[in-house]
Amino acid sequence: MEEFQVYLELNRSRRHDFLYPLIFREYIYALAHDHGLNKSMIFFENQGYGNKFSSLIVKRLIIRMDQQNHLIISANDSNQNPFFGHNNNLYSQMISAGFAVIVEIPFSLRLVSYSQGEEVAKSHNLQSIHSIFPFLEDKFSHLNYVLDVLIPHPIHLEILVQALRYWVKDASSLHLLRFSLYEYCNLKSFITPKKSISIFNPRLFLFLYNSHACEYESIFLFLRNQSSHLRSTSSGAFLERIYFYGKIEYLVEVFYNDFQNNLWLFKDPFIHFIRYQGKAILASKDTSLLMNKWKYYFVDLWQYYFYMWSQSGRVRINQLSKYSLDFLGYLSSVRLNPSVVRSQMLENSFIIDNAMKKLDTRIPIISLIGSLSKAKFCNTLGHPISKPTWADSSDSDIIDRFVRICRNLSHYHSGSSKKKSLYQIKYILRFSCVKTLARKHKSTVRAFLKRLGSEFLEEFFTETEEEHVFSLIFPRVFFTSRKLYRGRIWYLDIICINALVNHE
């Protein structure tokens, strides 16, 4: 029992004193500057975090606070207080940015020390969105069912604050965070953070959300590792940990001593959990009955342990062979790849039908066309239209914009099993570019193309350097006349989802 208690016990060494009065002192700026917190954010350079929020904003916060000299704040007098007057949004941004810098200090230092090791290249690769797909190719073909989980949001802001109590021992920091959340966010805008993101630092919001998710994922990891015993343990017994530990001790002793040869019936090594964009995937080789058990484990865990309202309808059980999973801009499914093998034994020959499971990743063409339609590159049917807002730019600038979008989409969707949909997207962008240029020069599309020749805009279909290398390695199988590499390529340098890919 002590082993399980140690496992569930959070690592107390990770707790830090985030004294929020530090943001009012001069030396916190020196601390942040000396450790190079901005440079340590190596995985978020493309998001422009270092350009908008840095340790310099903490310096400005210190100066502004000293000038205002309003450190004692009353929530009832927030409308009259000059600290929360017409500059309330500005001060909220400064406070949230300063708080984000403070809470990220230990994590940034840990990241810097880790990046100085020999495995820095590996850590970069693991940050890529595409790094999960080779894992799915290896694992999903052996699995049967998948739970498509819509993660519930906390029903109260206090839950997010309390999620930090294992990480932050200083009550003052929690009071500052609690005050800021209640002062500037209501529950509705926080669940759909379009308004709150403009006020609060996005990294602070993500830090709170991930800290909360870390708690229930650590318990789920315990469930996953002990799934061989939990199959005969109800969720109610799990929540009452005394009975839970007692039942596990009994099961371990009985199974190990008397039924050691039959342990494989109760173990489940083929279970995998992935969390992304407020959703989660639980894939397993279990039967539908056992997957239904996992479904109610999730619901009960969220409702009774983390006080998050959840219903069984938010967790759907699907069979991988009959279901396409909408996952990170791809429709992923497991399909059978039939093959016929002829075997010869002496004078007799046999025809053997062999079907192998293979992960199929396709582009959600309908959703992607919908995204292109919202961006005014085509209509709802996928017919290209001109981009009038770009008609005032130079020809080279217009072409460069379209080519850059086309290559970004090609780069992200390079792992598609079927390139026909990708070619259709390139076709839409190519003729949208032509129509935009024709609109600018007050000409028709046919006359414009006839004047420039058929080689115009060939760079839309020009292969990238990576595709050129693969075409040299596999020239007969994978290289086509359209200069499209037909094999799947997963790039390990993609850390952000393109806005057109994230069509939701």
Curated annotation (Swiss-Prot):
Superkingdom in the source lineage = Eukaryota
- InterPro entries, from UniProt? Domain_X, Maturase_MatK, Maturase_MatK_N
Q: For this UniProt entry, what's an example GO CC term?
A: chloroplast
Q: Which keywords does the record carry?
A: Chloroplast, mRNA processing, Plastid, RNA-binding, tRNA processing
Q: Where's it found, cell-wise? A: Plastid, Chloroplast
Q: Name one GO biological process term.
A: mRNA processing
An MF annotation (GO) of this entry = RNA binding
UniProt similarity note: Belongs to the intron maturase 2 family. MatK subfamily.
Q: What does this chain do?
A: Usually encoded in the trnK tRNA gene intron. Probably assists in splicing its own and other chloroplast group II introns.
Name of the molecule in the record: Maturase K
Name the source organism: Ochroma pyramidale
